[in-house]
């Protein structure tokens, strides 16, 4: 699965460290990621490969940091182009694939928090934690946590699998679901 990156370690604590030349850049545009694929594996651009306008620390895998590059239009060069994130699961699992999936979640969250849901004023990134803060009314918004369950239903050597009809990749999957509002 995407998160199975052992022996590597994912660190999602917020940090304000400066990007280094060999750190990785996660640049999303809609439902695409600026990257390239080599031998079925995802390759992410490095800080030294792009002209970043504003990098936002996302997380680290081991000692390697990943940064979000928002509102940028990177040119397709050196094999890098915008790849449909719905097809990421077709690639070989590894730290770059985990970074792409986790980064997309943060990208979508930051993109959806541009304006305060309480007063409508523009939000700002917190300077003390991973949060968006409204300077007008003080409303603070944190990334959503969506509890989920994935189960294997089996009878001896038989296994119940599902297949999602409207997904770009038509793979079989275990039965899965999310906790909705009001459920426990």
Language-model-detected regions and their locations in the chain:
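Acidic, metal-coordinating catalytic segment for phosphate/diphosphate chemistry
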Residues: 100-101, 105-149
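The catalytic Nudix box helix
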Residues: 173-184
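Residues in well-ordered beta-strands of folded domains
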Residues: 27, 59-60, 68-70, 124, ...
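Short N-terminal secondary-structure initiator segments
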Residues: 18-39, 99-119, 182
């Amino acid at each position: 699965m995407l998160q199975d990156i052992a022996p590597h370690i994912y660190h999602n604590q917020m940090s304000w460290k400066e990007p280094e030349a060999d750190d990785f850049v996660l640049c999303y545009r809609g439902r695409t990621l600026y990257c390239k694929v080599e031998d079925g594996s995802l390759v992410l651009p490095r800080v030294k490969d792009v002209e970043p306008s504003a990098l936002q620390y996302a997380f680290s895998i081991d000692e390697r940091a990943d940064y979000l590059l928002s509102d940028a239009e990177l040119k397709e060069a050196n094999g890098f182009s915008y790849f449909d994130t719905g097809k990421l699961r077709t690639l070989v699992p590894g730290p770059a694939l985990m970074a792409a999936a986790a980064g997309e979640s943060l990208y979508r969250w930051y993109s959806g928090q541009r304006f305060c849901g309480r007063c409508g004023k523009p939000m700002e990134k917190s300077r003390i934690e991973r949060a968006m803060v409204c300077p007008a009314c003080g409303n603070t918004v944190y990334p959503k946590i969506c509890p989920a369950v994935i189960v294997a239903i089996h009878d001896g050597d038989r296994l119940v699998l599902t297949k999602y009809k409207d997904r770009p990749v038509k793979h079989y999957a275990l039965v899965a679901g999310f906790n909705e509002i009001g459920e426990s």
